[in-house]
Regions:
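Basic, polyanion-binding surface patches
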Residues: 1-134
Length: 134
């Protein structure tokens, strides 16, 4: 996930992936995705999973951790996830090199009490956007 954020309307979440990510069209076609949060794994493992976004993801049994299934979609969720959200994709927009996905949260599950999550913060703008520096 290259960016994610909440929308002012309750239950809506915005996600962004590079258009070169092999899973983008699968997510759009299936209209389903699961997003998890954690503070139980190191950033090196997280980055290793997304290092080759233009290649086929590894088989579930080749992952370096255990998984469980999400309640509604039965999608694999990393066993170390403190929480996850199952989203129905209700729209998408191509924004240059990225695809913004608009998802409706249909299930949110807190699995483990978490102290903090791993976040990577980006600044997203395009030339001539008129955004002022913060």
């Amino acid at each position: 996930m290259d960016f994610q954020g909440h929308y002012p309307e309750p239950g809506i979440q915005l996600l962004g992936l590079k258009t070169s990510n092999i899973t983008v069209n699968r997510i759009i076609d299936s209209r389903r995705v699961v997003v998890s949060s954690t503070d139980q794994i190191d950033s090196k493992t997280v980055y290793a999973l997304g290092a080759h976004h233009s290649k086929e993801p590894p088989p579930i049994n080749n992952l370096p951790f255990e998984t469980c299934e999400s309640e509604i979609f039965n999608f694999p969720v990393p066993g170390f996830s403190s929480s996850y959200r199952e989203l129905e994709i209700v729209g998408h927009h191509i924004l240059g090199s990225h695809c913004m996905l608009v998802g409706h949260v249909i299930n949110a599950k807190q699995r483990i009490n978490s102290h903090s999550s791993f976040y990577q913060i980006h600044r997203f703008e395009y030339p001539g956007s008129g955004y002022r520096d913060i």
